[in-house]
């Protein structure tokens, strides 16, 4: 019996991980967010970063975005406690990365969220409480613009 050229064995797929360096393709912010986004006008105004990110989230439900925002809000709330350990809160925030990777693996539309989180959440970008607060402000603004643009179905029609 003749074997197929691309057959690699039972249960094996060819080119399963064609982009093994996906994270390297994503621009990671390499300085604290409160410094990177010091000019709030470039962040919050309709031609700013939050609006552009909301446009890129076309096809993603508000529910998926709010799941992440809820975790960010829990981190902010935890920082308000006197006993809060910043490293614990930071690690809790970093747990969003594998969660979003899993969701992106299940639904390709959600990979944009993972890419956004990889860009914004790393050891260099989250160095103090103020960075987590800036991330919260950014993501809250993204969701607001996403909703304004029509959420999942109509993002991009309000241009």
Task: Explain the meaning of each model-derived region.
Residues 1-159:
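Small/polar/charged residue-enriched interaction surfaces, especially the RNA/DNA-contacting tracks
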């Amino acid at each position: 019996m003749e074997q197929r050229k691309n057959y690699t064995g039972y249960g094996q797929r060819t080119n399963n991980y064609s982009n093994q360096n996906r994270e390297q393709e994503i621009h990671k912010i390499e300085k604290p967010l409160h410094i990177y986004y010091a000019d709030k006008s470039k962040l919050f105004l309709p031609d700013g970063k939050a609006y552009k990110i909301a446009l890129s989230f076309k096809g993603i439900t508000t529910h998926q975005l709010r799941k992440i925002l809820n975790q960010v809000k829990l981190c902010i709330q935890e920082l308000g406690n006197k006993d809060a350990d910043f490293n614990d809160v930071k690690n809790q925030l970093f747990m969003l990365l594998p969660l979003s990777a899993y969701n992106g693996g299940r639904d390709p539309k959600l990979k944009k969220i993972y890419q956004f989180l990889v860009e914004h959440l790393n050891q260099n970008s989250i160095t103090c409480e103020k960075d987590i607060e800036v991330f919260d402000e950014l993501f809250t603004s993204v969701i607001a613009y996403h909703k304004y643009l029509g959420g999942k179905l109509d993002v991009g029609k309000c241009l």
